[in-house]
């Protein structure tokens, strides 16, 4: 929830500043409402799965900051795609930088004895399919963000994640969770609210 909150709030600002290839978009009541509905969708979806364990405030804050970074990353990926003309370039850059940092951190942890290296594969082979999914996701979003903007992309991603959770629950666990179903409905409502074209601008920032 903290991550989605940070992502939605940041998406409004990123679009307002025009960091993404879709250009500058005003902060309107309609867009703010769409972002709030999107966050509410996640809150409702996970409401039946939260336990009573207290989560440290620093961890919540870290997730919020990570959400902010997601929106900025999506905007930058879109710019990279525009400059290069190839969505896979953005995906390649992300994974080169990410892999380099992970290798560096892992090397330090091995040297100080925090972790011990293990032979690969160290888990089920299907886990490694996540890397392929990541490449497809980043390549796709780097292209889509230029068409719809960062906020709408974020709302679409939230909707897709909740639908994916719904399908996995049905296929793997054999049941449907009522809060998750309601969360999916709210997520698509957020997309619809953000997509509807207002008759006149209601900008809160003075940007037409």
Regions from the language model: what does each represent?
Residues 1-9, 88-97, 135-169:
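Helix-helix packing/entry segments at the starts of transmembrane helices
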Residues 10-25, 72-84, 136-148, 192-200:
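C-terminal ends of transmembrane helices
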Residues 43-57, 109-123, 166-178:
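Membrane-interface helix termini and inter-helical loops of multi-pass transporters
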Residues 65-73, 111-151, 192-193:
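Hydrophobic alpha-helical transmembrane segments of multi-pass membrane transport proteins
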Residues 34-37, 61-62, 81-130, 160:
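Hydrophobic alpha-helical transmembrane segments of multi-pass integral membrane proteins
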Residues 1-9, 54-69, 118-134, 179-186:
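Structural signature of hydrophobic alpha-helical transmembrane segments
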Residues 12-68, 184-208:
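Juxtamembrane helix-loop boundary signature in multi-pass membrane transporters
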Residues 8-30, 162-180:
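C-terminal transmembrane-helix exit sites in multi-pass transporters
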């Amino acid at each position: 929830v903290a991550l989605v909150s940070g992502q939605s709030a940041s998406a409004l600002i990123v679009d307002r500043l025009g960091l993404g290839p879709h250009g500058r978009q005003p902060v309107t009541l309609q867009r703010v409402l769409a972002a709030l509905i999107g966050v509410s969708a996640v809150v409702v979806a996970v409401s039946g799965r939260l336990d009573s364990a207290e989560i440290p405030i620093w961890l919540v804050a870290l997730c919020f900051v990570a959400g902010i970074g997601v929106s900025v990353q999506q905007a930058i990926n879109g710019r990279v795609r525009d400059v290069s003309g190839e969505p896979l370039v953005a995906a390649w850059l992300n994974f080169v930088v990410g892999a380099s940092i992970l290798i560096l951190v892992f090397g330090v942890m091995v040297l100080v004895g925090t972790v011990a290296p293990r032979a690969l594969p160290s888990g089920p082979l299907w886990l490694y399919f996540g890397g392929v999914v990541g490449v497809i996701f980043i390549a796709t979003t780097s292209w889509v963000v230029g068409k719809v903007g960062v906020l709408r992309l974020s709302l679409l991603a939230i909707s897709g994640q909740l639908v994916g959770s719904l399908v996995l629950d049905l296929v793997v666990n054999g049941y449907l969770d009522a809060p998750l179903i309601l969360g999916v409905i709210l997520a698509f409502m957020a997309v619809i609210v953000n997509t509807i074209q207002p008759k006149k601008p209601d900008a809160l920032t003075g940007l037409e």
